[in-house]
């Protein structure tokens, strides 16, 4: 009998690009929109469009995945809150995926890179960065960190990716990988879904109540508006059952 692969719905809003993806079998469908200010308003309609295109409902989904961070405060909280709301409403588990992991997977897929450093603009003169090896799967060599651009110190020869290389081009110019870094690679729901399936299959998931953003700066409580987004997602999931 064929092995049935779990179906994952993924949400990623940690940067200026909002995206959602549905990974079902070997097929992946996605939606994306730019404009960080509209993420909370755009993501639920995109999710509903995606499910309608695939001809499925949340009842056909095995887990909700989200880009947990690091990234913009508002963005990672939006993704986490909406994932929680959908998971609560549909009684589904949640799979957090580190945004830098998703970038590294995209870099491997697009460039065949085996040793990767991801650098994401953290604003305020800082970057989020991490280093990975891809050998039969993605492994973190240096875990996600927040530092000044001068603190980015990958080990050995690496391929670079992320908008940190363009935002702090002068400060990072001394890195051998800087000149060829793919600055267009950003966190995306497609890779979030792909990594989440691996984690989910390995039993690495949490309840909606335990889902949290990954902050590398100080944690901030949810605002009233963000709680309303979460409630809207929960209501949408419940109405779709």
For each feature predicted by the language model, list its residue ranges.
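N-terminal beta-alpha supersecondary unit
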Residues: 2-68
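Residues at secondary-structure transition points
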Residues: 34-42, 73-77, 81, 98, ...
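Flexible, glycine/charged-enriched surface loops at secondary-structure junctions
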Residues: 205-209
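Short, hydrophobic alpha-helical segments
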Residues: 51, 196-204
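Surface "functional belts" at beta-alpha junctions
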Residues: 1-4, 27, 38, 93-187, ...
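Extended, charge-rich low-complexity interaction segments
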Residues: 211-229
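DPxDG-like acidic metal-binding loop motif
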Residues: 65-99
